[in-house]
Design a protein with these regions (language model features):
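Conserved beta-strand/loop scaffold segments within soluble protein domains that form the structured core
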Residues: 2-209, 213-216, 230-231, 238-253
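Short alpha-helical scaffolding segments that buttress acidic/His motifs in well-ordered protein cores
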Residues: 224-225
Protein backbone atom coordinates (compact mmCIF):
# COMPACT_ATOMS: atom_id res chain seq x y z
CA UNK A 1 0.00 0.00 0.00
CA UNK A 2 1.43 3.38 -1.02
CA UNK A 3 0.34 5.33 2.05
CA UNK A 4 1.80 8.47 3.59
CA UNK A 5 0.81 9.09 7.22
CA UNK A 6 0.72 12.57 8.70
CA UNK A 7 0.65 11.90 12.45
CA UNK A 8 0.67 14.73 15.02
CA UNK A 9 1.31 17.17 12.15
CA UNK A 10 4.50 15.40 11.04
CA UNK A 11 5.57 13.02 8.28
CA UNK A 12 8.55 10.77 8.87
CA UNK A 13 11.46 11.41 6.50
CA UNK A 14 11.58 8.72 3.86
CA UNK A 15 12.86 8.04 0.35
CA UNK A 16 12.31 5.49 -2.40
CA UNK A 17 12.53 5.54 -6.18
CA UNK A 18 9.16 7.33 -6.48
CA UNK A 19 9.34 10.01 -3.80
CA UNK A 20 11.36 11.66 -1.09
CA UNK A 21 10.02 13.15 2.14
CA UNK A 22 12.10 15.66 4.10
CA UNK A 23 10.76 18.08 6.74
CA UNK A 24 7.12 17.67 5.63
CA UNK A 25 8.08 18.27 1.99
CA UNK A 26 6.96 15.47 -0.31
CA UNK A 27 8.65 15.36 -3.72
CA UNK A 28 7.36 12.95 -6.34
CA UNK A 29 10.08 11.85 -8.76
CA UNK A 30 8.26 9.24 -10.87
CA UNK A 31 4.73 8.40 -11.96
CA UNK A 32 2.87 6.85 -9.04
CA UNK A 33 -0.34 6.44 -7.03
CA UNK A 34 -0.28 7.43 -3.34
CA UNK A 35 -2.64 8.18 -0.45
CA UNK A 36 -2.17 10.63 2.41
CA UNK A 37 -3.95 10.02 5.74
CA UNK A 38 -4.03 12.66 8.48
CA UNK A 39 -4.19 11.40 12.08
CA UNK A 40 -4.22 13.34 15.38
CA UNK A 41 -3.39 16.58 13.58
CA UNK A 42 -4.28 20.14 14.56
CA UNK A 43 -1.76 22.31 12.68
CA UNK A 44 -0.54 20.86 9.41
CA UNK A 45 2.01 22.46 7.10
CA UNK A 46 3.11 20.38 4.13
CA UNK A 47 4.42 20.90 0.62
CA UNK A 48 3.75 18.49 -2.25
CA UNK A 49 6.06 18.81 -5.25
CA UNK A 50 5.94 17.17 -8.68
CA UNK A 51 9.12 17.11 -10.76
CA UNK A 52 9.13 17.49 -14.56
CA UNK A 53 7.02 15.01 -16.57
CA UNK A 54 5.66 13.25 -13.47
CA UNK A 55 2.06 12.03 -13.26
CA UNK A 56 0.71 11.50 -9.73
CA UNK A 57 -2.68 10.21 -8.66
CA UNK A 58 -3.15 11.26 -5.04
CA UNK A 59 -5.87 10.59 -2.46
CA UNK A 60 -6.12 12.64 0.77
CA UNK A 61 -8.28 11.64 3.74
CA UNK A 62 -8.99 13.53 6.96
CA UNK A 63 -11.72 12.75 9.49
CA UNK A 64 -12.91 13.85 12.98
CA UNK A 65 -10.24 16.54 13.42
CA UNK A 66 -10.17 20.17 14.49
CA UNK A 67 -7.40 21.42 12.29
CA UNK A 68 -5.65 24.35 10.68
CA UNK A 69 -3.75 23.32 7.60
CA UNK A 70 -1.55 24.90 4.97
CA UNK A 71 -0.93 22.76 1.92
CA UNK A 72 1.18 23.89 -1.03
CA UNK A 73 1.29 22.01 -4.32
CA UNK A 74 4.15 22.83 -6.73
CA UNK A 75 3.82 21.38 -10.23
CA UNK A 76 6.68 21.48 -12.74
CA UNK A 77 6.99 21.22 -16.54
CA UNK A 78 4.54 18.77 -18.14
CA UNK A 79 3.67 17.32 -14.72
CA UNK A 80 0.10 16.37 -13.78
CA UNK A 81 -1.52 16.04 -10.37
CA UNK A 82 -4.81 14.14 -10.25
CA UNK A 83 -6.09 14.66 -6.71
CA UNK A 84 -9.09 13.14 -4.94
CA UNK A 85 -9.74 14.40 -1.43
CA UNK A 86 -12.32 13.56 1.25
CA UNK A 87 -12.84 15.34 4.59
CA UNK A 88 -15.39 14.91 7.40
CA UNK A 89 -14.04 16.99 10.26
CA UNK A 90 -15.22 18.95 13.30
CA UNK A 91 -13.72 22.34 12.39
CA UNK A 92 -11.33 23.23 9.58
CA UNK A 93 -9.37 26.27 8.46
CA UNK A 94 -7.36 25.34 5.38
CA UNK A 95 -5.16 27.31 3.02
CA UNK A 96 -4.46 25.65 -0.31
CA UNK A 97 -1.87 27.09 -2.70
CA UNK A 98 -1.40 25.48 -6.10
CA UNK A 99 1.59 26.73 -8.07
CA UNK A 100 1.53 25.69 -11.71
CA UNK A 101 5.17 26.57 -12.17
CA UNK A 102 5.96 24.59 -15.30
CA UNK A 103 5.06 24.80 -18.95
CA UNK A 104 2.02 22.53 -19.48
CA UNK A 105 1.67 21.91 -15.74
CA UNK A 106 -1.75 20.53 -14.85
CA UNK A 107 -3.86 20.00 -11.73
CA UNK A 108 -7.21 18.24 -11.47
CA UNK A 109 -8.39 18.85 -7.88
CA UNK A 110 -11.52 16.99 -6.70
CA UNK A 111 -12.68 17.62 -3.13
CA UNK A 112 -15.74 16.06 -1.45
CA UNK A 113 -16.54 16.78 2.17
CA UNK A 114 -19.14 16.61 4.91
CA UNK A 115 -19.23 19.83 6.91
CA UNK A 116 -20.20 19.26 10.53
CA UNK A 117 -18.87 22.37 12.29
CA UNK A 118 -17.24 25.56 11.03
CA UNK A 119 -15.03 25.34 7.97
CA UNK A 120 -13.17 27.84 5.82
CA UNK A 121 -11.16 27.03 2.71
CA UNK A 122 -8.94 29.56 0.99
CA UNK A 123 -7.57 28.59 -2.43
CA UNK A 124 -4.94 30.40 -4.48
CA UNK A 125 -4.19 28.83 -7.86
CA UNK A 126 -1.22 30.49 -9.55
CA UNK A 127 -0.75 29.95 -13.27
CA UNK A 128 2.96 30.77 -13.39
CA UNK A 129 3.66 29.44 -16.88
CA UNK A 130 2.05 29.12 -20.29
CA UNK A 131 -0.27 26.27 -21.34
CA UNK A 132 -0.97 25.41 -17.71
CA UNK A 133 -4.32 23.89 -16.72
CA UNK A 134 -6.29 24.02 -13.46
CA UNK A 135 -9.60 22.23 -12.87
CA UNK A 136 -10.96 22.70 -9.33
CA UNK A 137 -14.09 20.82 -8.25
CA UNK A 138 -15.46 21.16 -4.70
CA UNK A 139 -18.60 19.36 -3.49
CA UNK A 140 -19.74 19.85 0.11
CA UNK A 141 -22.62 18.62 2.21
CA UNK A 142 -23.31 21.04 5.06
CA UNK A 143 -25.15 19.53 8.02
CA UNK A 144 -27.62 21.44 10.21
CA UNK A 145 -25.05 22.99 12.52
CA UNK A 146 -22.41 23.35 9.84
CA UNK A 147 -21.03 26.54 8.33
CA UNK A 148 -18.73 26.57 5.32
CA UNK A 149 -16.89 29.24 3.35
CA UNK A 150 -15.00 28.76 0.09
CA UNK A 151 -12.77 31.62 -1.13
CA UNK A 152 -11.11 30.67 -4.42
CA UNK A 153 -8.66 32.83 -6.36
CA UNK A 154 -7.24 31.82 -9.73
CA UNK A 155 -4.40 34.10 -10.80
CA UNK A 156 -2.94 34.49 -14.30
CA UNK A 157 -0.38 37.21 -14.85
CA UNK A 158 0.67 38.82 -18.11
CA UNK A 159 2.92 36.75 -20.36
CA UNK A 160 1.52 33.30 -19.53
CA UNK A 161 -0.60 32.43 -22.57
CA UNK A 162 -2.93 29.63 -23.66
CA UNK A 163 -3.88 28.64 -20.12
CA UNK A 164 -7.12 26.93 -19.10
CA UNK A 165 -8.80 27.37 -15.73
CA UNK A 166 -12.02 26.10 -14.22
CA UNK A 167 -13.65 26.49 -10.80
CA UNK A 168 -16.74 24.43 -9.97
CA UNK A 169 -18.02 24.61 -6.39
CA UNK A 170 -21.32 23.29 -5.07
CA UNK A 171 -22.74 23.19 -1.53
CA UNK A 172 -25.81 21.20 -0.49
CA UNK A 173 -27.33 22.53 2.73
CA UNK A 174 -29.29 20.58 5.32
CA UNK A 175 -31.04 23.33 7.28
CA UNK A 176 -30.64 27.10 7.32
CA UNK A 177 -26.86 27.06 7.08
CA UNK A 178 -24.67 30.03 6.36
CA UNK A 179 -22.67 28.90 3.34
CA UNK A 180 -20.52 31.16 1.18
CA UNK A 181 -18.69 30.71 -2.13
CA UNK A 182 -16.41 33.49 -3.39
CA UNK A 183 -15.06 32.63 -6.86
CA UNK A 184 -12.43 35.03 -8.20
CA UNK A 185 -10.37 35.02 -11.37
CA UNK A 186 -7.60 37.57 -11.76
CA UNK A 187 -6.56 37.42 -15.41
CA UNK A 188 -4.15 39.75 -17.20
CA UNK A 189 -4.10 37.86 -20.52
CA UNK A 190 -6.55 37.66 -23.44
CA UNK A 191 -5.51 34.25 -24.78
CA UNK A 192 -7.11 32.13 -22.05
CA UNK A 193 -10.00 29.75 -21.38
CA UNK A 194 -11.71 30.53 -18.06
CA UNK A 195 -14.90 29.28 -16.42
CA UNK A 196 -16.43 29.22 -12.95
CA UNK A 197 -19.64 27.87 -11.47
CA UNK A 198 -20.96 28.29 -7.92
CA UNK A 199 -24.14 26.71 -6.56
CA UNK A 200 -25.61 26.69 -3.03
CA UNK A 201 -28.87 24.84 -2.48
CA UNK A 202 -30.60 21.58 -1.67
CA UNK A 203 -31.23 18.29 -3.40
CA UNK A 204 -33.94 18.83 -5.98
CA UNK A 205 -37.54 17.87 -5.32
CA UNK A 206 -37.58 16.12 -8.71
CA UNK A 207 -34.75 13.78 -7.69
CA UNK A 208 -36.45 12.97 -4.40
CA UNK A 209 -39.82 12.45 -6.06
CA UNK A 210 -38.31 10.09 -8.63
CA UNK A 211 -36.67 7.90 -5.99
CA UNK A 212 -39.72 7.87 -3.72
CA UNK A 213 -41.97 7.02 -6.68
CA UNK A 214 -39.88 3.84 -7.02
CA UNK A 215 -40.86 2.79 -3.50
CA UNK A 216 -37.80 4.14 -1.67
CA UNK A 217 -38.67 5.99 1.54
CA UNK A 218 -37.59 9.59 2.18
CA UNK A 219 -34.59 8.86 4.43
CA UNK A 220 -33.20 6.19 2.12
CA UNK A 221 -33.72 8.49 -0.87
CA UNK A 222 -31.70 11.24 0.82
CA UNK A 223 -28.97 8.74 1.66
CA UNK A 224 -28.78 7.58 -1.96
CA UNK A 225 -28.47 11.18 -3.14
CA UNK A 226 -25.74 11.82 -0.55
CA UNK A 227 -23.74 8.82 -1.76
CA UNK A 228 -24.14 9.81 -5.39
CA UNK A 229 -23.11 13.38 -4.65
CA UNK A 230 -19.98 12.47 -2.67
CA UNK A 231 -18.75 9.77 -5.03
CA UNK A 232 -19.49 11.73 -8.21
CA UNK A 233 -16.35 13.73 -7.37
CA UNK A 234 -14.12 10.82 -6.31
CA UNK A 235 -12.46 7.92 -8.10
CA UNK A 236 -11.35 5.55 -5.34
CA UNK A 237 -10.81 1.83 -4.76
CA UNK A 238 -13.14 -0.36 -2.69
CA UNK A 239 -11.18 0.06 0.56
CA UNK A 240 -11.38 3.85 0.38
CA UNK A 241 -15.00 3.69 -0.72
CA UNK A 242 -15.84 1.52 2.30
CA UNK A 243 -14.11 3.98 4.62
CA UNK A 244 -16.13 6.88 3.21
CA UNK A 245 -19.39 4.89 3.30
CA UNK A 246 -18.85 4.29 7.01
CA UNK A 247 -18.73 8.07 7.51
CA UNK A 248 -21.89 8.57 5.44
CA UNK A 249 -23.68 5.86 7.43
CA UNK A 250 -22.70 7.65 10.63
CA UNK A 251 -24.67 10.78 9.67
CA UNK A 252 -27.44 9.30 7.50
CA UNK A 253 -28.82 6.18 9.17
Amino acid sequence: MNNILVINNEIKDYENEYLSIVNNNITFKKNCDYSIYYENCNNVNISINLLDNVYVKLFEYMCDLEVESNIVYNISDSATLLLFKFYANKNVYENVVINLNGYMAKVNYNFSNICIGEEKYKFIINHNNSNSISDISNKSLCLEKGKIDFDIDTVLEKGNIKCSMNQDTKIINFGNNKSVIKPNMYIDVDDVSARHSSVIGNFSEEELFYLMSRGINYNDSIKLLVKGYIFSNLVVDMDKRSKILNIINKYWR
